[in-house]
């Protein structure tokens, strides 16, 4: 599971997810990618599940990049606890994903393989996504 090694503060405000992604919205490393179409928090478990689904499908071939990192702690209080007495303890980590953000990238495999691998990863995500490919250079 992905999580930061250390952070400046243990707890964070929840914040708001307004607008589209201005960074990380273009393919940087691979030729194919999985792009988010909705805003959401993606947990480190969901990121890992998507990565596993893709690696299992492509097996030895291809390289996969994970373009999102869970750097936001989500706190939870113990069950059946009375209100008050401060904020809960950090329970898990999430990545804040806005529409347009590229979540995974892939290279070194045919488009059909990449498309199917991304489809399997998309099933693990709590949001709608789309497959994006780098435009082909014509010689």
From Swiss-Prot:
Top-rank taxon, per record: Bacteria
Gene Ontology cellular-component annotations: ribonucleoprotein complex; ribosome
GO biological-process terms attached to the record: translation
Gene3D superfamilies in the record: Ribosomal protein L10e/L16
Residue ranges, compositional bias (Basic residues): 1-21
Region (Disordered): 1-23
InterPro entries assigned: Ribosomal_uL16, Ribosomal_uL16_bact-type, Ribosomal_uL16_CS, Ribosomal_uL16_dom, Ribosomal_uL16_sf
Keywords: Ribonucleoprotein, Ribosomal protein, RNA-binding, rRNA-binding, tRNA-binding
Record-level Gene Ontology MF annotations: rRNA binding; structural constituent of ribosome; tRNA binding
Quaternary organization: Part of the 50S ribosomal subunit.
HAMAP family, per the entry: Ribosomal_uL16
Family membership noted in the UniProt record: Belongs to the universal ribosomal protein uL16 family.
Role: Binds 23S rRNA and is also seen to make contacts with the A and possibly P site tRNAs.
Protein name: Large ribosomal subunit protein uL16
Organism encoding this protein: Acaryochloris marina (strain MBIC 11017)
Gene that encodes it: rplP
């Amino acid at each position: 599971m992905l999580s930061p090694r250390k952070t400046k503060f243990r707890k964070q405000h929840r914040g708001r997810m307004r607008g589209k992604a201005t960074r990380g919205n273009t393919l940087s490393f691979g030729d194919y990618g999985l792009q988010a179409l909705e805003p959401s928090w993606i947990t480190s478990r969901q990121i890992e599940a998507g990565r596993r689904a893709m690696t299992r499908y492509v097996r030895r071939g291809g390289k996969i990049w994970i373009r999102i990192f869970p750097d936001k702690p989500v706190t939870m209080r113990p069950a059946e606890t009375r209100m008050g007495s401060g904020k809960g303890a950090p329970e898990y980590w999430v990545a804040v994903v806005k529409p347009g953000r590229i979540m995974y990238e892939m290279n070194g495999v045919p488009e059909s393989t990449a498309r199917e691998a991304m489809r399997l990863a998309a099933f693990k995500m709590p949001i709608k996504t789309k497959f994006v490919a780098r435009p082909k250079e014509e010689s």
